């Protein structure tokens, strides 16, 4: 049995989980999310927990078991606590600003790069740290990765956009001038 899939998902107070035929809807204090139902699994809700059990025991079902449990757990965590990713903008003259739902990045190009935030995400700036937050973990991570991709950190000086938890492996420059 899947080690992750067999764990029951605790449903905190104030969170409502509706298991439908096609989708599982989760409503909480921060909003509502939904995740598709896998037809290979059986969803059961009892005494403050949601448990996923496999109908068959083939390879595809085992693969889906842990995945669907994690997706549902992320929905419950999102509507209660929310998720956030912090990005650091490092470099001389590199700046970041948030204007409504548009992030303006000045990261060494001849023009400012504008990134529009999708609905449901919020961005805040403190100094050189940009924080993306929202209730959908997948959307928060995808948006942070898109912003990082605009100017990845380079290994010689470390300039660029990096995750706050990321460490950049630095390289030694050329040792020129020796004859």
Curated annotation (Swiss-Prot):
Belongs to the universal ribosomal protein uL6 family. Coiled coil: none annotated. GO terms for molecular function: rRNA binding; structural constituent of ribosome. Part of the 50S ribosomal subunit. GO terms for biological process: cytoplasmic translation. It comes from Desulfovibrio desulfuricans (strain ATCC 27774 / DSM 6949 / MB). This protein binds to the 23S rRNA, and is important in its secondary structure. It is located near the subunit interface in the base of the L7/L12 stalk, and near the tRNA binding site of the peptidyltransferase center. Keywords: Ribonucleoprotein, Ribosomal protein, RNA-binding, rRNA-binding. The keyword Metal-binding does not apply. GO terms for cellular component: cytosolic large ribosomal subunit. It holds the Pfam family Ribosomal_L6. This is Large ribosomal subunit protein uL6. The keyword rRNA-binding applies. PROSITE patterns: RIBOSOMAL_L6_1.
């Amino acid at each position: 049995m899947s080690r992750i899939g067999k764990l029951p998902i605790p449903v905190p107070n104030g969170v409502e989980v509706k298991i439908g035929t096609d989708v599982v809807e989760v409503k909480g204090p921060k909003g509502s999310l939904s995740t598709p139902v896998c037809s290979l699994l059986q969803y059961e809700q009892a005494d403050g927990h949601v448990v996923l059990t496999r109908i068959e025991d083939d390879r595809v079902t085992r693969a889906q078991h842990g995945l669907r449990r994690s997706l549902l757990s992320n929905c419950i965590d999102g509507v209660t606590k929310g998720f956030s990713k912090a990005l650091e903008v490092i470099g001389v003259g590199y700046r970041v600003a948030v204007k409504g739902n548009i992030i303006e990045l000045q990261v060494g190009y001849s023009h400012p790069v504008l990134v529009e935030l999708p609905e449901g995400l919020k961005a805040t700036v403190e100094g050189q740290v940009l924080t993306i937050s929202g209730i959908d973990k997948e959307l928060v991570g995808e948006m942070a990765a898109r912003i990082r991709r605009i100017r990845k950190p380079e290994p010689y000086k470390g300039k660029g956009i990096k995750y706050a938890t990321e460490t950049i492996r630095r390289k030694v420059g050329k040792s020129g001038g020796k004859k």
